[in-house]
Regions:
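Short beta-strand and strand-turn-strand segments in soluble, beta-rich domains
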Residues: 39-40, 86-95
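Extracytoplasmic entry segments of secretory-pathway proteins
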Residues: 1-34
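Short aromatic-acidic-glycine turn motif
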Residues: 76-87
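N-terminal edge beta-strand
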Residues: 23-55
Length: 141
């Protein structure tokens, strides 16, 4: 797979926060990825509430049989990036707001949430979002 920077390199992440140093983590959130016999692909939990100013370490474990990704962004950014991925399905993410998680593995993403906003996390591998791989993050005061 060829790497690409996609939307996030072109965007200013200030409105959703920013990557952060592991030593500044104030909260850890475990997220699991699973696939069901009925064909659904899910993040658990699929709704996360975070206080503004919190630096979070997401620990994402893929318990499924397929590779997945955890992509964090605004609803608009994700929609744009989803279109990009449909045109370039073999591109690997190098975005600071995304991690790829092969089957049976765990990955981490450290992010500081600096403004009140609503965000989405999603797997943008073709067909995965449609199979249920998305969730929301509500950043509150």
């Amino acid at each position: 797979m060829k790497p690409h920077a996609g939307v996030s390199e072109k965007s200013n992440h200030n409105f959703i926060g920013s990557p952060s140093d592991d030593s500044l983590v104030t909260r850890e959130i475990e997220v699991s990825i699973r696939e069901t016999a009925a064909g659904y692909m899910l993040f658990e939990p699929d709704a996360i509430y975070i206080k503004k100013g919190t630096t979070v370490r997401f620990v994402i474990t893929n318990t499924g049989a397929m590779s997945h990704e955890f992509y964090l962004g605004s609803f608009d950014e994700i929609q744009q990036h989803e279109q990009w991925m449909r045109s370039h399905p073999d591109m690997a993410h190098v975005d600071q707001n995304a991690v790829a998680i092969p089957a049976g593995e765990t990955a981490e993403l450290v992010w500081k949430f600096s403004v009140e906003t609503n965000l989405e996390f999603v797997c943008l591998i073709d067909g995965h979002r449609e199979a249920g791989m998305w969730g929301v993050i509500i950043v509150h005061d």
